[in-house]
Regions:
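Active-site metal-binding loops of divalent metal-dependent hydrolases
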Residues: 18, 65, 119, 174, ...
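Active-site micro-motifs of SAM-dependent methyltransferase domains
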Residues: 20-22, 176, 200, 225, ...
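Catalytic pocket-lining loop regions of alpha/beta-barrel enzymes
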Residues: 113, 127-218, 229, 267
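Mid-to-C-terminal alpha-helical segments outside catalytic/metal-binding sites
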Residues: 1-16, 41-59, 207, 213-218, ...
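Mid-domain alpha/beta scaffold segments of enzyme catalytic cores
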Residues: 3-137, 141, 179-180
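Short alpha-helical
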Residues: 69-70, 97, 152-155, 234
Length: 268
């Protein structure tokens, strides 16, 4: 991916939510299930580029699709010589006695940007001092957290933002259906929302805009899972139309500048 500073006429577009995996590996994969006829196949960066490049998408932040610790390294190895992969949001369990050691191990790689947790682990971290300390380690390392869950999780996201102001948090797969985003999240500048929830309506996007504004919304496709909803072209085109109507400045923020602030990915 060319340096952003050199792309004045043609801005980069960064997809902050893709998954890569290979069931043909000797060890297989923990996800997706063999019973999923759409997703259970080898999905690698070259496959993503085939659907994304025609729309001007220049890079991606890969999000974990495996609870196996060594699969963090598997993605980092994929990214080593592939400049379209800007980084990984990995998987580490705050309940693990090895969390600190694994975090230190992976944080040495500049492409390791943070981890993803679902609603239950986030709630447990807020209640358990040891697990909470592990999330603070994440912030102290300059890394971030992707949060995935239902609307009920958002109260805990706000609590976490209050207790660890240095931790950048990206809420995955919004808008929810029906749209539901607490206005209180507007007060936390370190909390971002990733529009990766399928084909949101204008009203749903308006609600997100009212809470996060032009500085804290980021683009993510959720490919290849998004194929269950619509082709990549449709997913992209839906948000492209909405944010283009907001003007060039807002559009650039949505498609790459905000994600750079949230993930601290660097051009390669």
């Amino acid at each position: 991916m060319a340096g952003a500073a050199g792309l004045i006429g043609k801005s980069p577009i960064v997809d902050t939510h893709t998954h890569f995996y290979d069931p043909s590996r000797k060890q297989g994969v923990p996800w997706p299930s063999k019973t999923d006829p759409l997703l259970y196949r080898t999905v690698l960066p070259a496959d993503w580029r085939k659907v994304a490049t025609p729309h001007g998408v220049t890079g991606t932040v890969v999000v974990e699709a495996s609870a196996w610790v060594d699969d963090n390294q598997w993605i980092l190895d994929l990214a080593k010589n592939d400049k379209s992969l800007l980084g990984l949001v990995g998987h580490l369990e705050p309940t693990s006695a090895d969390f600190a050691a694994n975090l230190e191990r992976f944080a040495k790689n500049k492409l390791f940007l943070g981890i993803r947790l679902s609603a239950r682990p986030i709630a447990e971290c807020l209640a358990n001092p040891v697990q909470f300390a592990n999330l603070k380690r994440l912030a102290d390392a300059g890394l971030m957290l992707d949060a995935i869950g239902q609307p009920e999780m958002l109260t805990d996201v706000a609590r976490l933002a209050e207790r660890i102001p240095a931790l950048r948090i990206v809420i995955d797969h919004v808008p929810y259906s029906p749209p539901r985003m607490p206005k209180e999240l507007a007060q936390y500048p370190q909390v971002y929302a990733k529009v990766s929830g399928g084909m949101p309506s204008t009203d749903a996007l308006d609600e997100l805009w009212s809470v996060f504004g032009e500085d804290r919304l980021v683009y993510g496709s959720n490919w290849p899972v998004s194929d269950k909803v619509a082709p990549y072209a449709d997913i992209f085109g839906n948000v492209k139309k909405y944010f283009a109507a907001k003007g060039r400045v807002a559009e650039e923020k949505y498609f790459w500048k905000n994600s750079q602030a949230a993930y601290r990915w660097k051009t390669r």
